[in-house]
Amino acid sequence: MSLNFLDFEKPIVELETKIQALRDVSRHSTSASVDLDKELEQLEKKSLELKKKIFSDLGAWQVAQLARHPQRPYTLDYLKHIFTEFDELAGDRAYADDKAIVGGIARLEGRSVMVIGHQKGRETREKVKRNFGMPKPEGYRKALRLMEMAERFNMPIITFIDTAGAYPGVGAEERGQSEAIAKNLKVMSGLKVPVICNVVGEGGSGGALAIGVGDYVNMLQYSTYSVISPEGCASILWRDSDKAPQAAEAMGLIAPRLKELELIDEIIEEPLGGAHRDHKQTAENVKATLLRQLADLDALDHENLLERRYQRLMNYGYC
């Protein structure tokens, strides 16, 4: 897979270009060269050290760029790597099937679970089909239908959050976008089954919250969670979207800050360089977290599960 490098990764690009060139020479060389192998080893070591240095000191704006990376794993990628026997369920039984939300029953280590998440799309045609991962009311009502089904059949619910926000179009507003989001918040807070929410890319405002109320809320290391995009915040406060980097720093939208404020429960480590560099390893890290948290929640009866969730929600703002 050819990677799209971000601006702050330019020093890494130069090294990896040299490494790839040497690999090509080595691959097509008729006689092995010890000097070539040694130089390749030194460059790979230098590249690794450079990656560690750059990614150990990322600013909020750089993290926001990583969260939006076009090759970052999406919900369907996690379904492929973590779950088996996925049966997708479609439609809200009222208006339409919103492709920006995918969901259905799958198995996690042999156990039936309900998986729901945003899906952005990669190629142009798929992006349009998925509405760039911005759900309309019918998408959130589909998610609600699946969550209520999961409760009836006593299946844990696992959500994957990755959206710039709920779709703000006129049609969406006419069909009750805010009502759909509000109802999801209300219902999710009272579901009698374990709910684990994972912010895996962008966690944009109510569009993220509508599938983000749970017993555990996790964030991938380079994901973001905020009430508005940095560009939107900059446009409002400074009347200048170019001040998005300053806005990102001020908003506290990165995982460590949100963990400090106790708005999320756990930060899931990503491979060096970001989740887009290794989908499989990222999925393994997410899976390990899900299994551990499900085991914790399984020990609670319905009453204690709901009380724990209630206390979690009531503690917001009191850290």
Curated annotation (Swiss-Prot):
It is found in: Cytoplasm. GO terms for molecular function: acetyl-CoA carboxylase activity; ATP binding; carboxyl- or carbamoyltransferase activity. Keywords: ATP-binding, Cytoplasm, Fatty acid biosynthesis, Fatty acid metabolism, Lipid biosynthesis, Lipid metabolism, Nucleotide-binding, Transferase. GO terms for cellular component: acetyl-CoA carboxylase complex. Its EC number is 2.1.3.15. GO terms for biological process: fatty acid biosynthetic process; malonyl-CoA biosynthetic process. It catalyses: N(6)-carboxybiotinyl-L-lysyl-[protein] + acetyl-CoA = N(6)-biotinyl-L-lysyl-[protein] + malonyl-CoA. It comes from the Bacteria. Residues 35-296 form the CoA carboxyltransferase C-terminal domain. Pathway: Lipid metabolism; malonyl-CoA biosynthesis; malonyl-CoA from acetyl-CoA: step 1/1. Acetyl-CoA carboxylase is a heterohexamer composed of biotin carboxyl carrier protein (AccB), biotin carboxylase (AccC) and two subunits each of ACCase subunit alpha (AccA) and ACCase subunit beta (AccD). PANTHER family: ACETYL-COENZYME A CARBOXYLASE CARBOXYL TRANSFERASE SUBUNIT ALPHA, ACETYL-COENZYME A CARBOXYLASE CARBOXYL TRANSFERASE SUBUNIT ALPHA, CHLOROPLASTIC. Belongs to the AccA family. Component of the acetyl coenzyme A carboxylase (ACC) complex. First, biotin carboxylase catalyzes the carboxylation of biotin on its carrier protein (BCCP) and then the CO(2) group is transferred by the carboxyltransferase to acetyl-CoA to form malonyl-CoA. This is Acetyl-coenzyme A carboxylase carboxyl transferase subunit alpha.
